[in-house]
A protein has these predicted regions:
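C-terminal "cap" of GNAT-fold acetyltransferases
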Residues: 97, 147-150, 154-161, 166-167, ...
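A short beta-loop-alpha structural element at the N-terminal edge
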Residues: 6-21, 27-33
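Conserved acyl-donor/pantetheine-binding loop and adjacent beta-alpha core of acyl/acetyltransferases
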Residues: 82-117
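A short helix-loop-beta-strand connector motif used in the catalytic cores of GNAT acetyltransferases and
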Residues: 52-67, 84-88, 114
């Protein structure tokens, strides 16, 4: 298998794959949130796909993604954003409890480029593609003139945690995971950061 990936900007036609990759990266939380927002009779996946396809105000809008391809086939993708400084005041009564630790860690990451989602389709894992995606992330962030990349990872996601550590990310902070309905994960959310040279 050829191991060199080609990167491009996300396209509207990628929206179905991007919805899947976002949900995989978020360990089911995106689909749960979509299920709350979806209309009666609308599937969560259909709703998420449509939001990625058409809602320019969402961070997960398809134009904000970078897509990795092998021989013209989408194998993975990522997106992120600059965390505001100063971080806006949040009324925690306005957001569900299970999002509190995520928002708290995002606040700690103020000023960095937060890698919101990065994922590879299951059939393309184990070929070293994650490292190529992370290298592309660094190029994107450096081109913006920023000096640090942050990300959040669940403590139970051992494979991702290992890849991030191996690629120079260090733990900065953590918060106790609060499960959303249907989640079986436990432990902590970990905020990791990599300073760029």
């Amino acid at each position: 298998m050829q191991k060199v990936l080609r990167f491009r900007n996300g396209a509207k036609e990628d929206s179905g794959d991007l919805a899947l990759l976002l949900d995989v990266a978020g360990r089911g939380l995106p689909a749960y949130l979509w299920s709350i927002e979806a209309k009666q009779g609308q599937s969560a996946y259909e709703y998420g796909r449509e939001k990625i396809r058409s809602d320019e105000n969402r961070r997960s809008y398809y134009k904000n993604w970078y897509v990795a391809e092998k021989n013209g086939i989408l194998v993975g993708a990522f997106f992120g954003f600059i965390v505001e400084t100063p971080y806006p005041e949040i009324d925690y009564n306005d957001i569900p409890k299970y999002l509190h630790p995520i928002v708290e860690l995002e606040k700690v990451a103020s000023g960095s480029w937060l890698l919101q989602a990065i994922s590879i389709l299951p059939e393309y894992r184990g070929y070293g593609f994650a490292i190529q995606l992370l290298r592309k992330v660094e190029k994107v962030v450096k081109a913006l003139g920023l000096k640090s990349i942050s990300l959040q990872v669940e403590e139970v996601n051992n494979s991702a945690l290992g890849i991030y550590k191996k690629n120079g990310f260090e733990e900065i902070d953590r918060r106790t995971y609060i499960p959303f309905p249907g989640s079986r994960d436990t432990g902590d959310f970990i905020l990791m950061m990599k300073n760029l040279k």
